[in-house]
Structures are given as structure tokens and as C-alpha cells.
Amino acid sequence: MKKMPMRKRFGQHFLHDSFVLQKIVSAIHPQKTDTLVEIGPGRGALTDYLLTECDNLALVEIDGDLVAFLQKKYNQQKNITIYQNDALQFDFSSVKTDKPLRVVGNLPYNISTPLLFHLFSQIHCIEDMHFMLQKEVVRRITAEVGSHDYGRLSVMAQYFCDNTYLFTVSPQAFTPPPRVESAIIRLIPRHNFTPVAKNLDQLSHVVKEAFSYRRKTVGNALKKLINPSQWPLLEINPQLRPQELTVEDFVKISNILN
């Protein structure tokens, strides 16, 4: 079958290492009754492995040439549905299933963060997620409070999910090799986070505002939102830096604004 060209505008790096592919499938541990959604399947390297383990697989691919390639490759498969769609705009609840979705994929580096935020907005229909991401992004998602990597993505990802850094993947596992290392992460939605954010848009705004001034104290960084008299009510020291606040702290700040 004719090979498809890589398109830089889609951030395409195709995974080809069979050992890494098997390791990813083992981490996902798909079951026959699962409904899996693969974002950015490319030429179907991971798809081939998933098809043998799962009876209901949906592929979301933006590249029209790759969609045609995949339709031809899997035209005899009854357990696969291909959506030509931008994952950043895709309604994941539109996938026909009576079970929560298990979302997987080798996410394009150039859209990984906005795509994660899009998925968080649809977390109600997702059971878990396993992604290949730039290693730096995985470190930010799983960063601990007070660390250099802890920031906006850390707070929002940790509000919505329990996140586990699984393993690192070398650039040599891809064609063409990216300039940076990649890593596999598991994200499991949290449905009982305490305290609950009353307004998720407000929470996102507070976190974004705070980390726009991460070198300032949180009292100064959020002075447009929080007046000095409110900090004692929150039981948060306004002299702390934004990266020293926990997810719970940010939720409390957000909730006092509602």
C-alpha cells in the first residue's frame, strides 16, 4: 500500500517501533467490550494492535489523505468507524456507545495542550485516556506543587484527572524522529474532587491569571480578582507564589468569586 507523506502542519510523527506499540497496548489493556477512540491514528500502526483487542473502535483523523488511506486499509473491518474531523472540534459524546469512552492516541505536539483542555470539557463521557505526548508536557501534567514544571496545565489536569507518567519513548521510535523525547501518560477522570469548583470557566480564568505572573506573589498576581480582606477567609497566604498553591487552593479562590 502506498505510503502517505507526513504533513508538518499537522505535527505528524508516525510511531513505528513494534516494542513500544505493544507496551502502549499493554498499558491501555483494552477489553473486547470497550469503546476506544483513537485520536490521530496516522497510518494505523497502533490501530492494528487495538483492532485485535476491541470490538468497537472509532478513529478521529483530520488529514483527508490519511482518512482515505485508512478507509481503504480497513474497508473489511466491521468494528471500526472513521471520523474525518478536527479533534479540537470533535464532539466525543457523539460516538455511539452505551459505555464511557476510552480515549487513546499519539497527540500532535502542536495542539496537545488545547486538545487536553477540549477533552476536559467533555470528561463526563470518558472512562480513561492514554496518550503519547511530548515528555515536557507529561512532566507538566504530573508536576508536584512547588516544582519548576507546576503551572496552569498541572492544576487543571489534576483537578479533572488522576495522572500517571508511565514511560518515556525515544525519538528513534518515530518517522520522522521528533527533536524531543516523548512519554506515555494515563489520565483517569476524577468524579469526586473536593472541593468542587462551582464554575469551571471561573477556575480556568483564575489559574490562567495567576500563572501569567508566576514570579509575583499570588496576592499581587490576583489583585484584580481578590481583595486583601478575602485572603484570611480563604486561609491562603497571599505572599505565596502561584506555583506554591495546591489545586484545592485554586478551587477555593475560584469559588469565593461566585
Swiss-Prot record:
Its EC number is 2.1.1.182. InterPro entries: KsgA/Erm (IPR001737), rRNA_Ade_diMease-like_C (IPR023165), rRNA_Ade_Mease_Trfase_CS (IPR020596), rRNA_Ade_methylase_Trfase_N (IPR020598), rRNA_adenine_dimethylase (IPR011530), SAM-dependent_MTases_sf (IPR029063). S-adenosyl-L-methionine binds at H13, L15, G40, E61, D86, N106. SUPFAM superfamilies: S-adenosyl-L-methionine-dependent methyltransferases (SSF53335). Keywords: Cytoplasm, Methyltransferase, RNA-binding, rRNA processing, S-adenosyl-L-methionine, Transferase. One of its GO terms (cellular component) is cytosol. It holds the Pfam family RrnaAD. Specifically dimethylates two adjacent adenosines (A1518 and A1519) in the loop of a conserved hairpin near the 3'-end of 16S rRNA in the 30S particle. May play a critical role in biogenesis of 30S subunits. This is Ribosomal RNA small subunit methyltransferase A. It comes from Coxiella burnetii (strain Dugway 5J108-111). The gene is rsmA.
